Amino acid sequence: MATELTWHDVLADEKQQPYFINTLHTVAGERQSGITVYPPQKDVFNAFRFTELGDVKVVILGQDPYHGPGQAHGLAFSVRPGIAPPPSLVNMYKELEASIPGFVRPAHGYLESWARQGVLLLNTVLTVRAGQAHSHASLGWETFTDKVISLINQHREGVVFLLWGSHAQKKGAIIDPQRHHILKAPHPSPLSAHRGFFGCNHFALTNQWLEQHGEKTIDWTPVLPAESE
């Protein structure tokens, strides 16, 4: 049963913590000094904007945002309309083609339609310097996103967690497998997808789990906002 609690309810105290204020201050300082930081400030918390706590059915964990121009917009693995899908997302599409009947790979990589169905697309680090992967990994974001995972664990039941790669799988320690459904596989990156991401069947297994527990399944075909109106 969906909780009435919102992200605002459960995160208000966390956002007053000194570490969190310091994280925001550091990121703001870099932007003000002329360093390009992705995603743009208005998009940093989009994962929470598009998927409210009470609507979370699935969590897909990423690591840090894409660090190329115009890509990152606050949803893990997703890119803005007009930007070519990056290699990891292309491999996710390949797995969807292989496991979801009727899935046709789109030309875009914008996953907002997943988020609006209850798929929380959460990077564990929410900002990055342009061209420098993991450049904000030690700023405190992971303390915050670990708290987010623990709050989902606490306030929701029957959430499917898709943990791809060793970084995401370490977060499994925060999740109670008696309350939630955890699926693990290698990361969809070209470096590791052939080691077991392809063939993991996670998208189909997620829908199977949701259906068995009386939840609406996810339409995994990403739809651009204009197409869904």
UniProtKB/Swiss-Prot annotation:
Reactions the enzyme catalyzes: Hydrolyzes single-stranded DNA or mismatched double-stranded DNA and polynucleotides, releasing free uracil
Annotated catalytic residues: D64 (proton acceptor)
Keywords in alphabetical order: Cytoplasm, DNA damage, DNA repair, Hydrolase
GO cellular component, one term: cytoplasm
Top-tier EC class: hydrolase
Primary location: cytoplasm
Location of the protein in the cell: Cytoplasm
A GO term, aspect molecular function: uracil DNA N-glycosylase activity
Keyword Heme: no
One of the GO biological process terms: base-excision repair, AP site formation via deaminated base removal
Lineage top rank: taxon: Bacteria
CDD domains given in the database record: UDG-F1-like
EC number: 3.2.2.27
Positions in coiled-coil regions: none
Assembly and binders: Monomer.
Functional description taken from the UniProt entry: Excises uracil residues from the DNA which can arise as a result of misincorporation of dUMP residues by DNA polymerase or due to deamination of cytosine.
Family as reported in the entry's similarity comment: Belongs to the uracil-DNA glycosylase (UDG) superfamily. UNG family.
Name the record gives this protein: Uracil-DNA glycosylase
Biological source species: Salmonella typhimurium (strain LT2 / SGSC1412 / ATCC 700720)
